[in-house]
Curated annotation (Swiss-Prot):
The keyword Transferase applies. SUPFAM superfamilies: Aminomethyltransferase beta-barrel domain, Folate-binding domain. One of its GO terms (molecular function) is transaminase activity. It comes from Prochlorococcus marinus (strain MIT 9303). This is Aminomethyltransferase.
Length: 374
């Protein structure tokens, strides 16, 4: 298999990254160790190479109105310098992917450009789907990453580190806010233009940065010199799972609706605009989904993994979608689907792990919330 390499691939290897195939890319699963990386992000700061993810630019007349036909979230709620999390839907309300939409316009009344970040595993199919539905309306799609670097800097010290390196004040940038920042000392072109968004996939404060390859390599080395430890896919998974953030392809897929996945807050049925799957979701909103994604805590140290059966009265009633040992909580946690009648907080079920039944309790999500910044 010919795996793709990000511009930081050799730097990840040099930093001790243990590389594994992931969504067609050769990516680091860990560096110093999952526990150390996890704790660094929770307590200080860590960085992730996420350059495998897809980044598309949408340009034309009112691209937001055109994209609106494919997502259930009211995109008019965001303006220039703002972003939102949403999902791409098919005709039956099934989730094709989750994504973040960034408004790159100069004013809310005349937004001509959007940036969207999509999952690596869905990048090709998403692009085909978007072109099929957006290009006939005159919206042009292009690769905004352009073989560049997408870097996540996450943790309570992320703001201080990034302010020190950039010379910019970033503390006031709101969650899901974004801006272009001019960085000095990142290569031949001085200054380098860096897209910075206050977004992430860890449950911590932090930023995601999009920049050209050479500037990204220089920034990686500067962050290493600052003592920021590199983190791999392993700790990214334990961090996102503690925060109960969905992983597409495991916790939701084309056969899952937002209401089933606990993402009903993304569905804005009060807006008049039509969107893909609206009729199906209106019906499900009225009747209620027959199953729901739940958070689970297991007694003991056994780990529930994707696909493990969920049992009630010794009968299979659902499946685990994601599970891990939580370094922050010292408990085994998991996400999974249960019939709505069994999905209430406090309900007891069991997980079948290697032929044995392990008690589990339905709990409130997320499992972990970062301490208040105040």
């Amino acid at each position: 298999m010919n795996l793709q390499h990000t511009p930081l691939h050799d730097l990840c290897r040099d930093a001790g990254g243990r590389m594994v195939p992931f969504a067609g890319w050769d990516m680091p699963v860990q560096f110093s160790g999952l526990l150390q990386e996890h704790q660094a992000v929770r307590q200080q700061v860590g960085m992730f190479d996420i350059s495998h993810m897809g980044v598309l630019r949408l340009e034309g007349t009112n691209p937001k109105d055109t994209l609106q036909a494919l997502v259930p979230t009211d995109l008019n709620r965001i303006g220039p310098g703002e972003a939102c999390y949403t999902v791409l839907l098919n005709e039956t309300g099934g989730i094709l992917d989750d994504l973040v939409v960034y408004d790159l316009g100069t004013n809310k009344q005349d937004s001509q450009s959007l940036l969207i970040v999509i999952n690596a595993a869905c990048s090709e199919t998403d692009t085909i789907w978007l072109k099929q539905h957006l290009q006939p309306a005159g919206i042009a799609l292009s690769d905004a990453k352009n073989n560049g670097v997408l870097l996540a800097l996450q943790g309570p010290q992320a703001t201080k580190v990034l302010e020190r390196l950039s010379g910019e004040s970033l503390a006031s940038l709101p969650r899901f806010g974004h801006r272009q920042v001019q960085f000095y000392g990142l290569g031949a072109e001085d200054p380098s233009s860096v897209f910075i968004a206050r977004t992430g996939y860890t449950g911590e404060d932090g930023f995601e940065l999009l920049l050209e390859a050479e500037a990204g390599r220089a920034l990686w080395l500067q962050l290493r010199a600052e003592g920021v430890i590199p983190c791999g896919l392993g700790s990214r998974d334990t961090l996102r799972l503690e925060a109960a953030m969905h992983l597409y392809g495991q916790d939701m897929d084309i056969n899952t609706t937002p209401f089933e996945a606990g993402l009903g807050w993304l569905v804005h049925l009060e807006m008049p605009a039509p969107f893909m799957g609206r009729t199906a979701l209106e019906q499900q909103a009225e009747q209620g989904p027959i199953r729901r994604l739940v958070g689970l805590k297991l007694s003991g140290r056994a780990i529930a993994r994707h696909g493990y059966p969920l049992l009630h009265n010794n009968n299979k009633v659902g499946e685990i979608t994601s599970g891990t040992w939580s370094p922050s909580l010292g408990e085994a946690i998991a996400l999974g689907y249960l019939p709505t009648a069994l999905a209430r907080i406090g309900n007891e079920v069991a997980v079948e792990i290697r032929g044995k039944h392990h008690p589990a309790t339905v709990v409130k999500r997320p499992f972990y919330r970062r301490p208040s910044l105040s």
